[in-house]
Amino acid sequence: MAQEKVFPMTAEGKQKLEQELEYLKTVKRKEVVERIKIARSFGDLSENSEYDSAKEEQAFVEGRVTTLENMIRNAKIIEDDGGSNVVGLGKTVTFVELPDGDEESYTIVGSAEADPFEGKISNDSPIAKSLLGKKVDEEVTVQTPGGEMLVKIVKIS
């Protein structure tokens, strides 16, 4: 039997996934079932776009429920080791781009909870891979979609 993938994440990340799962199971499923029921009342299902749309949404919701259940079941909570001198999962790292000094901060999280718009990047991302295990004042070459850039780590928290 194949071993299931482990999803490293913070406790906060797991809690957010559990909240999303609860919402999908208790609220969204009921909404979709109601939409299907209403669409069925329109009659002929062969050309009923409301019905097709509701069934597609139901498939998406059920797929997301399955995905979330798997991620939660196989979550590996990353505990903060208390030290903040090394870049690791769950840590926020601030660095400056050399030589111009543009400062950026990211929290490194498991892929299941990554959200670049919230400043959370996956530990599997090229930037995180370059930074993991490094310390304050280290200069690191980071791979980005735009090419390589040299950064200096200024803070880890």
Curated annotation (Swiss-Prot):
Source superkingdom: Bacteria
Record keyword Mitochondrion present: no
Induction: By heat shock, salt stress, oxidative stress, glucose limitation and oxygen limitation.
PROSITE patterns: GREAB_1, GREAB_2
Keywords for the protein's UniProt record, in alphabetical order: Coiled coil, DNA-binding, Stress response, Transcription, Transcription regulation
Record bears the keyword Transcription: yes
One family name in Pfam for this protein: GreA_GreB
GO MF annotation terms: DNA binding; RNA polymerase binding
Coiled coil: 50-70
InterPro entries to which the protein is assigned, alphabetical: GreA/GreB_C_sf (IPR036953), TF_GreA/GreB_CS (IPR018151), Tscrpt_elong_fac_GreA (IPR006359), Tscrpt_elong_fac_GreA/B (IPR028624), Tscrpt_elong_fac_GreA/B_C (IPR001437), Tscrpt_elong_fac_GreA/B_fam (IPR023459), Tscrpt_elong_fac_GreA/B_N (IPR022691), Tscrpt_elong_fac_GreA/B_N_sf (IPR036805)
GO BP, sorted A to Z: DNA-templated transcription elongation; regulation of DNA-templated transcription elongation
Family of the protein in this entry: Belongs to the GreA/GreB family.
HAMAP family: GreA_GreB (MF_00105)
Role, per record: Necessary for efficient RNA polymerase transcription elongation past template-encoded arresting sites. The arresting sites in DNA have the property of trapping a certain fraction of elongating RNA polymerases that pass through, resulting in locked ternary complexes. Cleavage of the nascent transcript by cleavage factors such as GreA or GreB allows the resumption of elongation from the new 3'terminus. GreA releases sequences of 2 to 3 nucleotides.
PANTHER family assigned: TRANSCRIPTION ELONGATION FACTOR GREA (PTHR30437:SF4)
Protein name per Swiss-Prot or TrEMBL: Transcription elongation factor GreA
Organism: Bacillus subtilis (strain 168)
